[in-house]
Structures are given as C-alpha cells and as structure tokens.
Regions:
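Non-catalytic connector elements of ABC transporters
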Residues: 12, 247-338
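The feature captures the beta-strand-to-loop junction immediately N-terminal to the Walker
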Residues: 32-34
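Helix-to-loop junction immediately C-terminal to a conserved catalytic motif
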Residues: 47
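Conserved ABC transporter NBD signature motif
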Residues: 55-63
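ABC ATPase nucleotide-binding domains
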Residues: 73-75, 88-224
C-alpha cells in the first residue's frame, strides 16, 4: 500500500498543499488533471526526486519519506522514454538493476526473460534506441522500470508521445502488465478517456490539491465536484435555488447539478422523460462525430449532443420550437470546490 499524508511541496510559486493519497497494493491508480496541476510533482515526490517541506510517504508499511531514490524500490517511466542512446535494448533494460546489491542473482535473468516475452521485444534486444519506433522505445522503458520487481511503478504521461494506433496498443499492454504482474501502478495523465480505460481508481488533482478520488467507473459516471465535471466535458452545470425548481428536481437545498450533453433528449413532439421542457433551438455546431445543439428556455441554456443521422432526421434549425429533457438518473449532484 502507498500512503501519502499531509504532503507539502513548494517549487517556486507552485505548491502541493496537504495532499492525501492512498493506493492499495496491486492497484492501478491514475492521477488525472490538467497541465500544471501538480501530477508529475506528486510522482517525483513519491520517487524521491523532489524535496518536500513536510508530510509522510509510506510504501508497504515502510517510511520512505527521507530515503534516497535508489533505496525506495520504486521505478519511474517518462513520456520521452529516457533510454541511453549508446546502449542496446537489453543493456538499457538491465540498467534497471544497477542499484540491486544482488543484481547477479539468477532470478533477475529469469525476470528479464519474462519481461521480454510479456512486452514482445525479443527481436529488438540488440538494437540501439535510435533504430526503434516510439512504441518499441516505450516497451523497453517499461521493461527497464519493471525489472527487479519494484514495489511501485510510476508512469508519467507514458502514452502522450505516441501516435493514436500505437497508443491503443500500449494501453492494452499496460493493462496486460498489471493483470499479469499485479504491480502497484500510479499513472499520470491529462486524458480522462485514457484514465477511464486503464484505472481501477482515479484521483483528480488541480492546483496541487486532490479534488476528488474514487473508483473510476463511479467518478466518470457521476463526478462529485464541479471541477471534475467540467474537466470531463460536462457542459451543463447549473445552480438551482428557486423553490419551484428545487421541488421539481427533488432537491432539499440550493445545489449545483450537472447533466451530460449526451443524456439530453430532443424532439419536435412531447417526450417521455422525468424532466421535460419546452424551448427553442439556439446555436448548432458540427463537431464531426456529433452535433452540439443548444436548447434554450426562459431559465437557462442546455447543450445536447446528437448523432449526425439523428440531427438530420429531426431537421433542426436555429429558432425552431422543440421539446427537450432528461431522466432523473442522469442528474449529477455536484459540490463547489474549485
């Protein structure tokens, strides 16, 4: 288990403030957030690569807060691979054993062969990094990070430098690595689709603070904070305080709520949904994969996502009267912490 308690870091004007984080042994957690949120700083603090002002970092009941990086049994892999250009693939991988006092133990040769097979890199062991594709370099970087069976594998945006096709392949391999080796993994990304696919749990970070954390399926279906909802593309976020609306939405007190655009229904005829409104069509935007349609009534504007075929079927035009709405199960209750 990884336990980060009351972590405080100051790097120039940037701060990590009283950060709390728990990761179960063998868990795949994704640290998700926008650029400059502090994701990589947290990883490097766990790895011992940045100084901390205060706080405690425990791994498997061992206090590693003040240990040197080489004594933590933690590996970190970056998006730019960091392979040594003068070493071939097998030497780059074995370099991961440099701090092991028993690095000549036969168990590590067995470990090496298992990783080569798992990552499908047996045919490139003699090549130099300059002769490898981005995907091959990332596989080698992962093998180097995993050799020696670290307690924790830290991944800093491992997919961001890859083209889309290779990215999908490496995603599958990361999932396979975790399922096969049961290594505790913390991965940093700004891509919530990546996070949703790979993570068992997600911690969302912004401006050096954990905004929200929990099981990935729960957070992506119904985020609990305004920041998380906005970050994941939920455009319909409203403050409800009018007594009539509070009663209509079944809310006990003034609250923020969110509705995913894809959960809003539009029709030229009355529709059977829990919350039904009449209004007019506002702006219409073609986003290639879907059409974003604004539905406006006297109280607020809603964004709805429609497939192109359904949009064409409805023959919607700006200013056209429509019925729109959504179901109670799709109403997301949010707290303001941004």
């Amino acid at each position: 288990m990884i336990f980060v308690k009351d972590l405080n870091i100051k790097l120039g004007i940037f701060q990590i403030k009283n950060l709390q984080l728990k990761v179960k042994k063998g868990e795949f957690l994704v640290l998700l957030g926008p650029t400059a949120a502090g994701k990589s700083v947290v990883l490097e603090a766990i790895a011992g690569l940045v100084p901390i002002q205060s706080g405690k970092i425990m791994v498997n009941n061992r206090d590693i807060t003040h240990l040197k990086p080489e004594h933590r049994n933690i590996s970190i892999c970056y998006q730019d691979y960091n392979l040594f250009p003068h070493m071939n693939v097998q030497d780059n991988i074995r370099y991961g054993l440099r701090f092991k006092k028993d690095r000549n133990n036969p168990k590590y040769e067995k470990n090496f062969k298992e990783l080569v097979k798992l990552l499908k890199i047996g045919d490139i062991l003699k090549r130099l990094p300059i002769n490898l594709s981005g995907g091959e370099q990332q596989r080698v970087s992962l093998a180097r990070g995993l050799i020696g069976n670290p307690d924790v594998l830290l991944l800093d945006e491992p997919l961001s430098a890859l083209d889309p096709n290779i990215k999908t392949t490496i995603q599958e391999e990361l999932k396979n690595i975790h399922q096969t080796l049961h290594t505790t993994i913390i991965m940093v990304t700004h891509d919530f689709v990546e996070a949703n696919y790979l993570a068992e749990r997600v911690a969302i970070i912004n401006e050096g603070e954990i905004v929200e954390q929990g099981y990935s399926e729960e957070i992506f279906q119904k985020p609990g904070s305004i920041f998380a909802a906005r970050f994941m593309g939920i455009k319909n976020i409203f403050w409800i305080e009018n007594p009539e609306e509070l009663s209509y939405f079944g809310l006990e007190k003034p609250s923020y709520v969110g509705i995913r655009p894809e959960n809003i229904y539009i029709s030229q005829e009355p529709i059977s949904v829990d919350y039904h409104f009449k209004g007019t069509i506002g702006d219409i935007q073609n986003n290639q994969i879907f059409m974003e349609v604004k539905c406006c009534n006297s109280k607020r504007n809603y964004s709805a996502y429609l497939t192109v075929n359904y949009f064409l079927k409805l023959k919607l035009k700006k200013g056209q009267p429509v019925h729109f709405g959504f179901n109670k199960e799709n109403l997301i209750h949010l707290k303001k912490n941004d």
